[in-house]
Amino acid sequence: MIISAASDYRAAAQRILPPFLFHYMDGGAYSEYTLRRNVEDLSEVALRQRILKNMSDLSLETTLFNEKLSMPVALAPVGLCGMYARRGEVQAAKAADAHGIPFTLSTVSVCPIEEVAPAIKRPMWFQLYVLRDRGFMRNALERAKAAGCSTLVFTVDMPTPGARYRDAHSGMSGPNAAMRRYLQAVTHPQWAWDVGLNGRPHDLGNISAYLGKPTGLEDYIGWLGNNFDPSISWKDLEWIRDFWDGPMVIKGILDPEDARDAVRFGADGIVVSNHGGRQLDGVLSSARALPAIADAVKGDIAILADSGIRNGLDVVRMIALGADTVLLGRAFLYALATAGQAGVANLLNLIEKEMKVAMTLTGAKSISEITQDSLVQGLGKELPTALAPMAKGNAA
């Protein structure tokens, strides 16, 4: 099979993975309207083509939280990576490290902090959920600090799990889920051998000690479901800000006022995100939400964005809309499921090449030159409706 884009990795992953795993990563909440709009809205953002700009000295390098990045991309925190490839978090982290970008380890990773951190040279980032068990949160932060994690990504858009219809149909949840998952596994031999048999243990490595002796996926899902905390407020985050002395990023911002609150709180960064369309269906896509947020807080706080990014052109679009850096989620997971570390490495190379093409043809020699001026201005048909008002200048 020829691989030339993330969409090719998606097709390959669908063949390799048991359906419950493929649809868990590929699906979204409710009718998946926001999931679709994340991709579609971003694809409608039109860029200005510029010519004869002498682009021979183009550079993708940038700096974030005093870290040098080879391009403005980091791998997002994605749960259960170790179920998509053998010790998947380690493989993805190695690919990111080799490319000179950060890897973010999820709270609900298969591989624990202590397994992933020593496998790479670059300090990784760590993602933490808001949980009722503050003792677990404090312990996780202590482990992250001990492992040398440089940045904390604090996910705040999950006070309760989203309603994901696909999971019930695919076997991730619902009646007879364990038997359905088993039958799917044995009919997907490549995955069964590489991950099912040789990728053990399949614990959630950062959590397993808190569950005693879990017997299956339902034990982890049950523990998490009972520990998400809907009572959380900005005040509850103060002890984390006091405890964590490195950069702290608030993930799950879609409203300018929440972005301003993050600045007042003292966060170092925010992630404009709707959790990949997996939480509340019907909310704005990240591409639609980003311009107003950038208008409110650009320059006061680092702005990251995720949800809907599938290629290097999308990265350039997000930066033009106001992001400083983007996070890749599903795109790298498709590649990981298809070819492990090599797949993620190849995807990152593709994204870098695509970014260079987009920057060359828009006349942006550096990341700082990708701005609102890079967008086609004043043409509502080319921009999603919610983005058109932020465009300034002449049509090109």
Swiss-Prot record:
It comes from the Bacteria. Keywords: Cell inner membrane, Cell membrane, Flavoprotein, FMN, Membrane, Oxidoreductase. Its main location: membrane. It is an enzyme of class 1 (oxidoreductase). It is found in: Cell inner membrane. The keyword Transmembrane does not apply. Gene3D superfamilies: Aldolase class I. One of its GO terms (molecular function) is FMN binding. The keyword Iron does not apply. One of its GO terms (biological process) is aerobic respiration. One of its GO terms (cellular component) is plasma membrane. Its EC number is 1.1.-.-. The active site is at H275. It catalyses: (S)-lactate + A = pyruvate + AH2. Residues 1-380 form the FMN hydroxy acid dehydrogenase domain. Its cofactor is FMN. It is a peripheral membrane protein. Substrate binds at Y24, Y129, R164, R278. Belongs to the FMN-dependent alpha-hydroxy acid dehydrogenase family. Catalyzes the conversion of L-lactate to pyruvate. Is coupled to the respiratory chain. This is L-lactate dehydrogenase. It comes from Escherichia coli O139:H28 (strain E24377A / ETEC). The lineage of its organism: Bacteria, Pseudomonadati, Pseudomonadota, Gammaproteobacteria, Enterobacterales.
